[in-house]
Amino acid sequence: MSDALKKSIVDAIEEGQLKLGYREETIRLYYPLSSLCTLMHQSMDAAQMTRALTTFSEQVKGELGEIEVSRKGERFCLAVGPKGAAWVHEHTDPSGFLADFIAAIGRHGCTMDELLAIFRRHGGHVHVEALHNGEFDWLVYFEDGRPDAYYYCIADEGCRLTYHRFTKEDYEAFGFETT
């Protein structure tokens, strides 16, 4: 079983539940083949990945319930059923870093200083880097991967801050320029 893929699925569902609230419903997550290969720690073509994901879904069925796998070309959809949504809701921390981060960035008038204070409150080694790539203004992440290993790309949209979070590997694959 791919622990990295399971973590990615759980983290994405948790993020959605923190933003939109919990509902016991099917959640569809979309992944490009390249990201799945990184998460599965091996190179595969689309047909091989489909088989690997079918095996993976059987392995995590006890926790995440049924996961329906479909694809169009090299774009995969993992449809996690209501049982999986409920399991994530019951097994994630509603008061951790991600909850604090999402609550702050979702508030009108949130500043970068507020976000950095949240990062520093939850972890001791915070990397902050100004970006000049036309997409994002800052890259922030926990250097030691605790409490999470995602790369947070934050943009100042003038009236509010927005973000996208990436695995280190996906961030590097995008080739964003840094200062």
Question: What are the functions of these language-model segments?
Answer:
Residues 1-29:
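Positively charged, polyanion-binding regions of nucleic-acid-associated proteins
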Residues 23-43, 98-104:
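Short glycine-rich, basic-tinged beta-strand/loop micro-motifs
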Residues 27, 37-66:
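Charge-enriched amphipathic alpha-helical scaffolds
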Residues 88-99, 127, 134:
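Long, charge-rich, low-complexity intrinsically disordered regions
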Residues 117-151:
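A cross-family detector of function-defining hotspots
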Residues 146-177:
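Intrinsically disordered, low-complexity regulatory segments enriched in Ser/Thr/Pro
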